[in-house]
Amino acid sequence: GLLNTFKDWAISIAKGAGKGVLTTLSCKLDKSC
């Protein structure tokens, strides 16, 4: 239902945001950006 759709959407956004943060952090640590 709607709640499940919303939950999946929130999870995928959280995953995407987490990946972005990890990429930025490793980039800054490695000075590779």
Curated annotation (Swiss-Prot):
Cystine crosslinks: C27-C33
Chief localisation class: secreted
Cell location: Secreted
GO biological process: defense response to bacterium
Sorted UniProt keywords: Amphibian defense peptide, Antibiotic, Antimicrobial, Disulfide bond, Secreted
Keyword Secreted assigned: yes
Tissue: Expressed by the skin glands.
One cellular component term from this protein's GO annotations in UniProt: extracellular region
InterPro entries membership: Antimicrobial_frog_2
UniProt family annotation: Belongs to the frog skin active peptide (FSAP) family. Brevinin subfamily.
Function: Has antibacterial activity against Gram-positive bacteria.
Protein name per its UniProtKB record: Rugosin-A
Species per Swiss-Prot/TrEMBL record: Glandirana rugosa (Japanese wrinkled frog)
